[in-house]
Amino acid sequence: MADKYDVFDQLGELENTLNTTLTQISGIRQVLEASMTENATLRMELEKLRDRLAEFEKKEVKKETPKDQPNPNLIQIFNEGFHICHLHYAERLAEGESCLDCLELLYR
């Protein structure tokens, strides 16, 4: 009979051990779920930040590109018949003359 009680005692101890293990597994699962949720949130935030950075970098590149149009004041002076180049600045252009230096300055 004593052996039967020993078996019941061992089953009781095993049940307690299994309950403790199950509680530990449940705790680990909760921590893992929280970590996975946080990871997903951080990944989405990182992607949004990368998109914003890419937009910002595109804007910076656009700011750094030279203007397609020359300075309107220089165009006006040149159209009035004056040199705008460094060599002959403010000298009158001869009739029908075009100065390559002036044109280069305008369309640089």
Curated annotation (Swiss-Prot):
Cofactor: Zn(2+)
Listed GO biological process terms: DNA replication
GO CC terms of this entry: nucleoid
Keyword Protein biosynthesis: no
Intrachain S-S bonds: none
Record keywords, A-Z: Cytoplasm, DNA replication, DNA replication inhibitor, Metal-binding, Zinc
Main location: cytoplasm
Cellular compartments annotated: Cytoplasm, Nucleoid
Cofactor stoichiometry and binding remark: Binds 1 zinc ion per subunit.
Keyword Cytoplasm: yes
UniProt cross-references to InterPro entries, sorted A to Z: YabA (IPR010377)
Binding-site list for Zn(2+): H83, C85, C99, C102
Family affiliation: Belongs to the YabA family.
Function: Involved in control of chromosome replication initiation. Inhibits the cooperative binding of DnaA to the oriC region, thus negatively regulating initiation of chromosome replication. Inhibits the ability of DnaA-ATP to form a helix on DNA; does not disassemble preformed DnaA-DNA helices. Decreases the residence time of DnaA on the chromosome at its binding sites (oriC, replication forks and promoter-binding sites). Tethers DnaA to the replication machinery via the DNA polymerase beta sliding clamp subunit (dnaN).
Subunit structure and binding partners: Homotetramer. Interacts with both DnaA and DnaN, acting as a bridge between these two proteins.
Identification of the protein by name: Replication initiation control protein YabA
Originating organism: Lactococcus lactis subsp. cremoris (strain MG1363)
